[in-house]
Design a protein with these regions (language model features):
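DUTPase catalytic domain/fold
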Residues: 1-222
Length: 222
């Protein structure tokens, strides 16, 4: 295989069969000519300081001082698939750890993406390769709804093992559903010695599952 190339769809499928790429769950119908489709997972996370939820006639920020959302508001948000969320602009500090609320997405209701809110979502598939460089990006069908699937950091690390967190923004209100084809992954061959992700990764955890919030605060030692 030439160095520095991008795997074709048939080569991705061959590498999965040979165990050089691990995708769980895997469906052959998601193989494209030059990429692999990945589907949307069933959990969404929002920073507590960036949205307002309406429940019982009241609008409550995810956090107001030390007051968290009531169970009623949490249940209402899940029941309505995020329809009761509106933007709430508070300062995000990259030196600080920010808490998130996580909601399960009902596959029948889906989740309504709203402009002005940043959503942490994730792939349903767990992906790992110790040989190739994975690159994740949106699908054109999702992009034409003016939904941005991955704001930045599209390159994955060789050796990473887990579901991929997606940084989702939308221009218009758009409802999305778990299990739908949401993004795609390409696999690049690498040139030179490979570094062990578990030894050199900046934010190494055990297998990453579900949406993971920013860990930028760790670089400041706080």
């Amino acid at each position: 295989m030439p160095e520095g190339g991008v795997l074709t769809g048939p080569e991705i499928q061959r590498c999965i069969r040979e165990g050089r790429i691990s995708v769980t769950p895997f469906d052959e119908k998601y193989i494209n000519p030059g990429s692999l489709d990945l589907t949307l997972g069933d959990t969404v996370a929002l920073y507590r300081d960036t949205a307002v939820v309406s429940a019982g006639g009241f609008d409550l920020p995810f956090r107001t001082g030390t007051m968290d959302l009531t169970e009623e508001a949490l249940r209402a948000t899940t029941r309505q698939g995020g329809k009761n969320l509106t933007p709430y602009y508070a300062e995000m500090d990259s030196k600080k750890q920010h808490d998130v609320w996580k909601f399960d997405i009902d596959p029948k209701i889906g989740w309504l993406l709203r402009p002005g809110i940043g959503y942490l979502m994730h792939t349903a598939e767990r992906v790992c390769t110790k040989e190739f460089v994975p690159v994740i990006d949106g699908k054109s069908s999702i992009g034409r709804l003016f939904v941005m699937v991955h704001v930045t950091a599209g390159y994955g690390d060789t050796g990473f093992d887990g579901q991929y967190t997606l940084e989702v923004l939308t221009t218009y209100p758009v409802r999305v559903y778990p299990g739908m084809r949401f993004c795609q992954m390409r696999f690049h061959t690498s040139v030179g010695d490979r570094l062990n992700y578990r030894a050199y990764g900046n934010y190494v955890d055990d297998a990453s599952m579900g949406p993971v919030p920013s860990k930028s605060w760790k670089q400041f030692g706080t």
